Each structure stands twice: as C-alpha cells, then as structure tokens.
From Swiss-Prot:
NCBIfam families to which the protein is assigned, alphabetical: lipid_A_lpxA (TIGR01852), PRK05289.1 (NF003657)
Keywords on record: Acyltransferase, Cytoplasm, Lipid A biosynthesis, Lipid biosynthesis, Lipid metabolism, Repeat, Transferase
Role noted for this protein: Involved in the biosynthesis of lipid A, a phosphorylated glycolipid that anchors the lipopolysaccharide to the outer membrane of the cell.
Organism taxonomic ancestry: Bacteria, Pseudomonadati, Pseudomonadota, Gammaproteobacteria, Pasteurellales
Coiled coil: none
InterPro entries in UniProt: Acetyltransf_C, Acetyltransf_C_sf, Hexapep, Hexapep_transf_CS, Lipid_A_LpxA, Trimer_LpxA-like_sf
GO cellular component: cytoplasm; membrane
Protein name in UniProt: Acyl-[acyl-carrier-protein]--UDP-N-acetylglucosamine O-acyltransferase
Length: 262
C-alpha cells in the first residue's frame, strides 16, 4: 500500500505488499523488496535498497547506495525469518550497510532514534544501537554489538562481536574494541584502552558538576584503585542507590560478558 501523498520516482521498484507512508519520498533507482514498511516523511535519496522484513520509522534521511535489511553474512544463516527495525529521525549516509538479524541472536537488528551513521558504516546482524549515537566514516560493528545512548564511534574503528559499549562513551578514530566499554569512558587504540571520562560530552548534555565528580570517582575506582571489578562493584551499587546517573554502571555490568577494557 502506497499512501497517496508519497512521492515515488518512476524508476524506483517497489514490490507489491510494501507499505509506504504519508509524504515518504523514494528517489531514482531505489528498490523495495519484501515485507517492508517505510513510515511518514522518510526520504530515500536514490539507489537505496531495502529488503526483507524491515521497518523504517518516521523522518529518516537515507542517502544513495545504502543497503538495509539485506541477508546477513553469518554462515549459519539459512534464510530464517528475521527482522531489521529502524526508528525515527536518523541520518544514514552513503554506502551504509545494515543487515538483518539471525535466529541464533535476538532475531532483530535494531537502530533507535536520532542517530547519525556516516559514509561506509557497517552494522552487522543482531546489533542494537540505541539513541543519539554517531558512527563516523568506515566504522564497523560486528554481529550482536550493543551501543547504548549517546555513543560516538570514531572513523575506521571496529567493534568485536558481542561487545557492549556503555552510554556516553567516546571511541577515538581507528580503535579496535574487543571488550566491553563502561559508560562515560573515553577510549582509543588497538586494542582500545581507557583514557579518562568523556567530560566534554557530559557537559554538552547538561550533566552537573557534582554528578561528573561522582563519575570521575567511579572511573578511578575501576582503573586506578588496584581493586578487581568484583571488589569495586558493591561500592558502585551502593552509590547508585542515591544517584540515578550511576545506575548506568550497574545495569551495564549486569549485561557485560566479555570483561571490560583495561
């Protein structure tokens, strides 16, 4: 079903059964195949391919030669029914690839709202990107990677399968990330190592000085106290009882399975 207000270029190919919403623009040579839904006011510039069981939300801007919902590169994948879901108000630049999920994972590759994926970004099967993230040119996420809110991934960086990157993390360009990155941390290198707290990012997002002071103290507990993670966690949990900003740490460590960067 194509909404009457949608604008479809005559060279675009749209498979019967696709749902195209109000004021959607689909430019030259785009291909829409499968049970695709594209919601209101989303723009596909040109030469965009959307396949499979894919939902793209409202007010997204998707640039030329991007591929969304394509068969993933997991050799175990045998055509099972899996999904790709993209939220609202994302900017997805040229040559980005976003692959559908697998049944061995959560079955869904998901991107939230207000994210920027720059040129040549790859988002592999079962990745979960939350909101307000920036992935710079040529950043690569392997399968099952999770990015929490406000993560910045520098250009030419690569993140290993199953890694979790906590909220407000900044990864410098060219980083190779093979372990989980705690919230609020700046990291860079091959392999990525922590280099302090992302204070500039926190200031821009309205964190007050007392909260940033507590976050810095937790960073010191994790990386400069000489204590093991098991020794530090009860102290962090105690602080989190009275400071909601610190609850990010507690929730992160409950999910972490690969150990944290050191």
């Amino acid at each position: 079903m194509i909404h009457p207000s949608a604008k479809i270029h005559p060279t675009a190919l749209i498979e019967e059964g696709a749902v195209i919403g109000e004021d959607v623009f689909i430019g030259p040579f785009c291909i829409i195949e499968g049970t695709v839904e594209i919601k209101a006011r989303t723009v596909l510039k040109s030469h965009v391919v959307v396949r499979g069981d894919t939902v793209i939300g409202e007010d997204n801007e998707i640039y030329q030669f991007t591929s969304i919902g394509e068969v993933n590169q997991d050799l175990k994948y045998k055509g099972e029914a899996t999904k790709t879901i993209i939220g609202n108000s994302n900017k997805i630049r040229e040559h980005v690839t976003i692959h559908r999920g697998t049944i061995q994972g959560c079955g869904v590759t998901a991107i939230g709202n207000n994210n920027l994926l720059m040129i040549n970004v790859h988002v592999a099967h079962d990745c979960q990107i939350k909101n307000n993230c920036i992935l710079a040119n040529n950043a690569t996420l392997a399968g099952h990677v999770e990015l929490d809110d406000f993560v910045i991934v520098g250009g030419m960086s690569a993140i290993h399968q199953f890694v979790i990157v906590g909220a407000h993390v900044m990864l410098g360009g060219g980083s190779m990330v093979s372990q989980d990155v705690p919230p609020y941390v700046m990291a860079q290198g091959n392999h990525a190592r922590p280099f302090g707290v992302n204070l500039e990012g926190l200031k821009r997002r309205g964190f007050d000085k007392p909260t940033m002071h507590v976050i810095r103290n937790i960073y010191k507990m994790l990386y400069r106290s000489g204590k093991t993670l098991e020794e530090v966690l009860p102290e962090i949990e105690q602080i989190a009882e009275t400071d909601s900003a610190i609850s990010f740490f507690v929730e992160f460590f409950k999910r972490s399975t690969r150990g944290i960067i050191r």
